[in-house]
Amino acid sequence: MRSLTTKTSSALLTVWGLLSVSLMPSVGQADKTAGDYFVHSLPGAPAGPLLKMHAGHIEVTPEHHGNIFFWHFQNRHIANKQRTVIWLNGGPGCSSEDGALMEIGPYRVKDGSNGPKLEYNPGSWDEFANVMFVDNPVGTGFSFVDSDSYIHDLPEMADQFVQFLEKWFALFPEYEHDDLYLAGESYAGQHIPYITKAILERNKKPDAKHKWPVKGMLIGNGWISPVEQYMSYLPFAYEKGLVKKDSEKAKKLESQQAICTKMLNENGGRDKVDNSQCEQILQEILSTTQSKGSDGNMQCYNMYDVRLKDSYPSCGMNWPPDLVNVTPYLRRSDVVAALHISPEKRTGWTECNGAVGSAFRAANSKPSIQILPELLAEVPTILFSGAEDLICNHIGTEELISNMEWNGGKGFELGSGTWAPRRDWEFEGEPAGFWQEARNLTYVLFYNSSHMVPFDYARRTRDMLDRFMKVDIASIGGAPTDSRIDGEKGLETSVGGHPNSTAAAEAEEERLEAAKWNAYYKSGEIVLVIVVIAASAWGYYIWRERRQRAGYAGIFGGDTPMALAGARSGSRGAAGLEDFRNKRNARDVEAADFDESELDELHVRSPTDDMDRDRYSVGSASDDESIGKRNGNGKGKEKSYS
């Protein structure tokens, strides 16, 4: 019996030891606090106070070493309430660091003299909202998982994302009651609706301690309805003049479109997220329209911005240009350390992971267009499109809206025979696009923009976001941007014009710098006046001495030591004063207008006062316009919508 007990104890200890080893990563994760994720410094960041940010991994599947990476930026200012935006890029398998460093994040990566450096993004979305970029699903970007454990379907991805949020909010409970917005582009048009649905279902469970208040979805150039998107390729090519209608090229493309239509109408084709025969339409457009460039090499249209050309068969895979700086920046060892990248992440950052995209076939998933109507009953949504994108073009988005029934109507129908108007949008005096809305859905078309709208027009997308979130700066001050829809300004939204925004801070610094030099200049004038007065007094003194000495000379004779000394002094004094007068005549300070109040101002705001003055937070929003991802057709034939 004792032997059996000993063996049993030994066996239990062995089992416990194995369990302890297997649970070690989870325990390590559980022991982490928010402070462990705090980013203390960021290589290449602009001078001044660093934005408040957290970054790192949250473990979601310990048994497969599955970790999701996030990069969270705290809002710079609060308008009337706390808001959090979660941003997702597409692919599937493309990193949301595209969004962080090329689109809506606070920084853009530029080429510096000593390597990549960060500059403030004039239209970053973190002015009045916390913004979190998530590399989703596992295996994407800085996220990682065992290579045999990639995600395959949309519901599985959404459930894992909710699990990530549960753990994230446990670490950062102060954000759990924020108004929550899910935003992204391209294939995120599948991810976002599925995640939103999973959150709404989670909120209805009795064991949900806190309901997460989902207030909106924003999807740019979204891959939402494959049917409408496939059928839009040829009309878009005609509209943009890529292919001439009734030409031989057009006939070949129409033949491929007929094959696609047949596939969609058979064997549940309309219920599939991807269809290889239909994707061939896009391939044929890019192939049949290729031409020889000035360098003698073949080139094709950039599928993300048809105003541009790229080498064939890349056709946009070398775009956007910022990528040449972003990739080496995110692979720097000091950046990896600053963002708390786990040593378990053994490979460097890549924009799009082909293995993740290959695994994520969504073979058992329905396209998100089929769940969008039910979501619109609860969640306000914006669909926005860049007018020059081919791969997820605006015609496809407009068609899916026209064909969709939601909230008691079809398309943008307002009533019998009436439709929601397209309202012209003007931003800072330029035509920016149009807005159209009905029954909880808003559609925005951005003129002259690509697949990655925020890359082109970050400030305009920030204006769109602030309008959608109903940010109103009237009560907090600041200069609103001049943004008008059908000539009406609506709520006062700020795009880098808030008193504490980056642009405002930069403008304030320029103003202070000018004031400082103005103060120095005025100080110089004052010194000059003092010198003139002193010189005049000295000159008067010398003149009086000469007069007196002249009198002494008349009494004592001209050869006395005193007379000679007086003559030499007088000569030097007169010559020196005359020279000074000649210089002074060029600019008579005393004769110039002089405002005594300037002396008071100089006293109030001296150069040292300016240096001691508290600066505004460096990293508020700023101002400027500044593109998306990724059909992987040029990369191993894998399609990736970023």
From Swiss-Prot:
Active site: 186, 389, 451
GO molecular function ontology, one term from the record: serine-type carboxypeptidase activity
GO biological process, one term: proteolysis
Bilayer disposition of the protein: Single-pass type I membrane protein
Disulfide bonds: none
Signal peptide start-end: 1-30
Topology, Cytoplasmic side: 544-642
InterPro entries assigned: AB_hydrolase_fold, Peptidase_S10, Ser_caboxypep_ser_AS
Swiss-Prot/TrEMBL catalytic activity: Preferential release of a C-terminal arginine or lysine residue
Enzyme class: hydrolase
Highest rank taxon of the organism: Eukaryota
Biased composition (Basic and acidic residues): 600-616
EC number: 3.4.16.6
Intracellular or extracellular location(s): Golgi apparatus, trans-Golgi network membrane
Keyword Transmembrane helix attributed: yes
TM ranges: 523-543
Residues in the Lumenal compartment per record: 31-522
Annotated stretches, region: Disordered: 480-505, 598-642
A cellular component annotation (GO) from this entry: membrane
Known glycosylation sites: 440, 448, 500
Keyword set, alphabetical order: Apoptosis, Carboxypeptidase, Glycoprotein, Golgi apparatus, Hydrolase, Membrane, Protease, Signal, Transmembrane, Transmembrane helix
Family: Belongs to the peptidase S10 family.
Role of this protein: Protease with a carboxypeptidase B-like function involved in the C-terminal processing of the lysine and arginine residues from protein precursors. Promotes cell fusion and is involved in the programmed cell death.
Protein known as: Pheromone-processing carboxypeptidase kex1
